[in-house]
């Protein structure tokens, strides 16, 4: 773009002839990935669509399996997997045709600012309102919904803290003996969820870093492309279809020891969230020139020492971010675990789903707000201790 600017090309020509051809594969890839994410979504359709009888493949799949029609549910899962393969193929087709006009290496120090003039304040206000509506208002809504006895009535006389700190003596007939902060079932589910997140993070983060290292060091080879595609493929599979596969495996004669165990949750979550860590590993390793490691190889430095004393310190924030993302993903995941948990209140997220299914909206709102606060706390503590943060990007 700067070369075109020096040659007096106007902004419209630069965008049409330079910028768009370069970023078009990325735009198409983003569209395909967002389409895949929306297509495989389960939580949003089941919460918002059930009331108006709007069903998707994911919600239909779970309903069929729970009703005893496993065969039909597995067929829907198979169709979802085929669509995921198709999306992956189209994505690889477009991203494999990247164009590049790079003539020299290095980064420019030129900064181009756009003067908004009178539009400065309107645009700023619009962005503030937009951010507040989608980021702050939901938190306020969950907080209010968790302290009212009758939904929709926000008068002070209708508010209570029972759903948070209510004791057994003051409990309503709601299926719980106390508020969520004083209930042992909730704390057990929270501890399992945190333990699951930490175990999955350790497995996925380490595997993602190693996959990124191997793919970057063998960049361009057929094996590298194959490994990178296979590591990314679970992202394109609907979480409900993914859980259905492992449900079928765990209920088979040879693998019944997995059914309803903590181990099967670790296994399915590790594979499902591997794409995020592998992508983070690839991005972080691509930013390190191979000459740095080659210098250590010449001096006979072992591979383990090169990883721990050279590569990891250079990309510490990016690598730790690769460990952080699986933690956050596990802490908010519902669809992946709803078919595999031994009972509805085994994990905090499945407990939330159980509350909403049985009509206990206040408990559901309280648990949702608690999950959000825990995720924010994890991100804040990680940022303070290591400098890595989810809001600063993954693998950047």
What are these regions (language model features)?
Residues 1, 15, 25, 109-113, ...:
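Cytoplasmic-entry segments and transmembrane alpha-helices of multi-pass inner-membrane transporters
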Residues 1, 5, 9-14, 44, ...:
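C-terminal transmembrane helix and the adjacent membrane-cytosol boundary/short C-terminal tail
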Residues 11-40, 125-139, 233, 271, ...:
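Transmembrane alpha-helices
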Residues 12-13, 45-53, 108-113, 148, ...:
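Membrane-interfacial helix termini and adjacent extracytoplasmic/periplasmic loops
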Residues 14-19, 92-96, 141, 197-231, ...:
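Transmembrane-helix boundary motif in ABC transporter permease subunits
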Residues 25-26, 35, 184-197, 236-238, ...:
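Loop-to-helix entry region at the N-terminal start of transmembrane alpha-helices
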Residues 38-42, 46-85, 116-120, 149-175, ...:
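Interhelical loop and adjacent transmembrane-helix boundary motif
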Residues 76, 80-192, 258-262, 379, ...:
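N-terminal, non-cleaved signal-anchor transmembrane helix
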């Amino acid at each position: 773009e700067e070369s075109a600017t020096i040659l007096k090309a106007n902004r419209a020509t630069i965008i049409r002839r330079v910028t768009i051809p370069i970023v078009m594969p990325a735009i198409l890839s983003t569209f395909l990935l967002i389409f895949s994410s929306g297509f495989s979504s389960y939580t949003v359709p089941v919460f918002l669509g059930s009331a108006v009888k709007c069903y998707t493949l994911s919600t239909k799949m779970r309903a069929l399996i729970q009703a005893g029609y496993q065969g039909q549910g597995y067929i829907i899962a198979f169709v979802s997997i085929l669509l995921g393969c198709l999306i992956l193929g189209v994505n690889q087709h477009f991203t494999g045709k990247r164009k590049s006009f790079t003539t020299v290496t290095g980064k420019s120090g030129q900064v181009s600012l756009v003067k908004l003039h009178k539009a400065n304040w309107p645009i700023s206000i619009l962005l503030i309102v937009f951010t507040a509506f989608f980021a702050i208002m939901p938190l306020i809504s969950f907080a209010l919904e968790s302290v009212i006895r009758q939904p929709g009535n926000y008068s002070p006389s209708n508010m209570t803290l029972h759903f948070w700190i209510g004791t057994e003596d003051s409990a309503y007939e709601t299926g719980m003996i106390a508020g969520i902060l004083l209930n042992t079932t909730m704390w057990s589910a929270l501890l399992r969820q945190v333990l699951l997140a930490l175990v999955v993070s350790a497995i996925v983060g380490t595997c993602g870093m190693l996959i990124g290292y191997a793919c970057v060091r063998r960049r361009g080879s057929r094996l590298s492309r194959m490994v990178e595609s296979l590591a990314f493929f679970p992202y394109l599979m609907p979480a409900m279809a993914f859980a259905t596969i492992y449900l079928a495996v765990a209920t088979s004669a040879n693998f019944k020891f997995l059914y309803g165990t903590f181990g099967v949750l670790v296994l399915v979550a590790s594979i499902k969230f591997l794409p995020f860590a592998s992508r983070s590993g690839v991005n972080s390793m691509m930013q390190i020139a191979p000459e740095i490691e080659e210098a250590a190889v010449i001096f006979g430095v072992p591979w383990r020492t090169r990883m721990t004393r050279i590569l990891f310190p250079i990309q510490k924030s990016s690598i730790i971010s690769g460990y952080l993302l699986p933690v956050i993903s596990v802490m908010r995941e519902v669809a992946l675990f709803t078919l595999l948990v031994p009972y509805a209140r085994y994990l905090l997220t499945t407990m939330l789903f159980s509350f909403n299914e049985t009509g206990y909206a206040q408990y559901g709102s309280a648990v949702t707000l608690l999950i959000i606060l825990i995720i924010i706390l994890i991100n804040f503590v990680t940022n303070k201790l290591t400098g890595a943060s989810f809001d600063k990007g993954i693998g950047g």
